[in-house]
């Protein structure tokens, strides 16, 4: 098995880490940053940008720049969460043929899993550049409160990106691994994870290398994006009051506001007020308009108070489910960029009645934990046992539209549970198994994971046939269900890929597309490198001709200048062979110039220098070869 990387696939930012010499190391990307914006953009020329470069051009290309796609993954288009996101997103969200949410960009539809896979490819490349080897195996994190559809879609994204996803691990559990790996004492901890788009709270018991999740809860549609939106709404209304102009329909202005809101939110974590100054935000008949609004920390906290209040319910439920009170918790670990906000920290203190622990990097700790889990799976990290739980109850629909639970929430996974059911009518030849996930008592109020039929039941009075339904949840939290007629031995099973989601055929197609796109990216990179190399050479030779051109004859000089012109023309085109050929021609043409340069340089360094011993260039007798380099270096300097 090769190296296993750990990826925190975040709503706002993503991060990748790997085990190096027994320790987890966070890997910086090409731009030198340890986190990468989870943003994908599609340019007019057909180029695909991922990360910081995509974020930088978002203002001028907002309709084709996709962000926060994690909030859409594994969700139905008609869900209230997707409809809300659709109302505030500059890019187009539409309904896929299977009822899922999809994104439409430049005339093509993309599933959220496909967009996520593009971010994963960037993280994979970041790791490959650092490690100098091809990576195929990964551990990817998801919010603990993600349902089966969202987990499956995340796994699909990994597959499309060319990754073998060894494990899907919950973000708070990963953070607990990173926090507790070197801890020797037994303790009960709460991991409070508020990120860009999701909120999780997990209660764990740590001791002797065992990380046991006692309960988990959360909200998969609550995070920094919602806080930003409250600030944006405030700025829009203030600007309308001040200037009488509503800028909600101006996508470019809204993108500038989004960036300003995010920046202001961050600044207000350390200062009491900030100025939001956006010149030329819009214009009317009287001329350009500028936005200049002062935002205080108190005003911002008032704007987001309702969101902060929503953090308490899941925490109380998680404590209750774990059978603990706040005073039983030894440490509260803060995870996710939003936990830097002073009001959030204050809320955590109010809920748990203690100061939260701030000793981990909230942006990196999840990726670090994922890398540790990779180390556990690869055998590099010993004596660590992770016992995670399923966040939501699982069951089937029974007579009267009731949900009968087979596996209760917070059951340790992997797990398997069977229960015997029967028919509801005489001579019923088949039963339809409607698989559900959720906590409500009626089937219609819960999420449908899938349906399948067990057919060929022999005629019998109702209540006589015995049908055994078995639920199996693997270590990734992904569900498999089977139904067996104990009388005939007939069995029918499905691996739940949700009532929608991508089919295996669609995934394979997207994998092939991603591979071909990878080849395109490689060719583009080669072209850019060839252009840069040829351009740099042309510049260097041009500079030398100005300095040493009088040392070669006019015909030779004209030949070199002609070769430079050919290089300049070639780099304007897209033919890599033409660029390389022009560069080779310039290399050959500039040989005479190079000889003239070296001849002049060697003459300049021939005479003895003051204070040097006898011999050329001040080299004393018996000196080592490397000393020649030192002497020449000193002389040139």
Swiss-Prot record:
Gene Ontology molecular-function annotations: ATP binding; ATP-dependent protein folding chaperone; unfolded protein binding
Induction and repression of expression: By stress conditions e.g. heat shock.
A Pfam short name: HSP70
PROSITE patterns attached to this UniProt entry: HSP70_1 (PS00297), HSP70_2 (PS00329), HSP70_3 (PS01036)
Record bears the keyword Zinc: no
Composition bias, Gly residues: 608-621
Modified residues (Phosphothreonine): 198
CDD domains linked to this entry: ASKHA_NBD_HSP70_DnaK-like (cd10234)
Region named Disordered: 597-637
Transmembrane segments: none
Keywords, in A-Z order: ATP-binding, Chaperone, Nucleotide-binding, Phosphoprotein, Stress response
Chaperone found in the keyword field: yes
SUPFAM superfamilies: Actin-like ATPase domain (SSF53067), Heat shock protein 70kD (HSP70), C-terminal subdomain (SSF100934), Heat shock protein 70kD (HSP70), peptide-binding domain (SSF100920)
Biased amino acid composition, Acidic residues: 627-637
Function noted in UniProt: Acts as a chaperone.
PANTHER family in alphabetical order: HEAT SHOCK PROTEIN 70KDA
Family indicated by similarity: Belongs to the heat shock protein 70 family.
Name of the molecule in the record: Chaperone protein DnaK
Organism: Syntrophus aciditrophicus (strain SB)
Gene name as annotated: dnaK
């Amino acid at each position: 098995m090769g190296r296993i990387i750990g990826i925190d696939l975040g709503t706002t930012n993503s991060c990748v880490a790997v085990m190096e010499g027994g320790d987890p190391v966070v890997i910086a990307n090409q731009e030198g940053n340890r986190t990468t914006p989870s943003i994908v953009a599609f340019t007019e020329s057909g180029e695909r940008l991922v990360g910081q470069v995509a974020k930088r051009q978002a203002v001028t290309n907002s309709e084709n720049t996709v962000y926060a796609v994690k909030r859409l993954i594994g969700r139905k288009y008609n869900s209230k969460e997707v409809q809300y996101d659709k109302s505030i997103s500059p890019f187009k969200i539409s309904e896929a043929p299977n009822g899922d949410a999809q994104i439409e960009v430049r005339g093509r539809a993309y599933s959220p899993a496909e967009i996520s896979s593009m971010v994963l490819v960037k993280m994979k490349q970041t790791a490959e550049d650092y490690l100098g080897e091809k990576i195929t195996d990964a551990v990817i994190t998801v919010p603990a409160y993600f349902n089966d559809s969202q987990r499956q879609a995340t796994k699909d994204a990994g597959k499309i990106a060319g990754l073998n996803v060894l494990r899907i691990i919950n973000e708070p559990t990963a953070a607990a691994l990173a926090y507790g790996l070197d801890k020797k004492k037994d303790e009960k901890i709460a991991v409070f994870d508020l990120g860009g788009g999701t909120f999780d709270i997990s209660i764990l018991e740590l001791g002797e290398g065992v990380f046991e999740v006692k309960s988990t809860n959360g909200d998969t549609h609550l995070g920094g994006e919602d806080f930003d939106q409250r600030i944006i709404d405030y700025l829009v209304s203030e600007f309308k009051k001040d200037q009488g102009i509503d800028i909600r329909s101006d996508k470019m202005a809204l993108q500038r506001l989004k960036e300003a809101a995010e920046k202001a939110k961050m600044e207000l974590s350390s200062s009491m007020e900030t100025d939001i100054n956006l010149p030329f935000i819009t214009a009317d008949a009287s001329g350009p308009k500028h936005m200049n609004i002062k935002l205080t920390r108190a005003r911002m906290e008032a704007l987001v108070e309702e969101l902060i209040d929503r953090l308490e319910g899941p925490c109380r439920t998680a404590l209750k489910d774990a059978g603990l009170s706040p005073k039983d918790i030894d440490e509260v670990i803060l995870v996710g960029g939003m936990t830097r906000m002073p009001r959030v920290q204050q809320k955590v203190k109010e809920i748990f009645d203690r100061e939260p622990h701030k000793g981990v990097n909230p942006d990196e700790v999840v990726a670090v934990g994922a890398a540790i889990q990779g180390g556990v799976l690869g055998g590099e990290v010993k004596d660590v046992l992770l016992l995670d739980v399923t966040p939501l109850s699982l069951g089937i629909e029974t007579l009267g539209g009731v949900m009968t639970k087979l596996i209760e929430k917070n059951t340790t996974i992997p797990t398997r549970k069977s229960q015997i059911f029967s028919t509801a009518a005489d001579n019923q030849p088949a039963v339809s198994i409607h698989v559900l996930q959720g906590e409500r008592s009626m089937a219609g109020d819960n999420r449908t994971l899938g349906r399948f039929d067990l057919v060929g039941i022999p005629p019998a009075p109702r209540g006589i046939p015995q049908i055994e339904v078995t639920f199996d949840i693997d270590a990734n939290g992904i569900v498999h269900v089977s139904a067996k007629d104990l009388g005939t031995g007939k069995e029918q099973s499905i691996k739940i890929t949700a009532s929608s989601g991508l089919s295996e055929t669609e995934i394979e197609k997207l994998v092939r597309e991603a591979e071909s796109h990878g080849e395109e990216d490689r060719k583009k990179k080669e072209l850019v490198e060839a252009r840069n190399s040829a351009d740099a050479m042309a510049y260097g030779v041009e500079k030398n001709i100005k300095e040493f051109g009088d040392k070669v004859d006019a015909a030779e000089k004209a030949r070199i200048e002609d070769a430079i012109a050919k290089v300049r023309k070639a780099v304007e085109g897209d033919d890599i062979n033409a660029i390389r050929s022009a560069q080779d021609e310039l290399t050959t043409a500039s040989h005479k110039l190079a000889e003239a340069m070296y001849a002049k340089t060697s003459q300049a360094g021939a005479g003895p220098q003051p204070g040097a011993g006898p011999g050329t260039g001040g080299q004393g007798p018996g000196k080592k070869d490397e000393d020649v380099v030192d002497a020449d270096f000193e002389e040139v300097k």
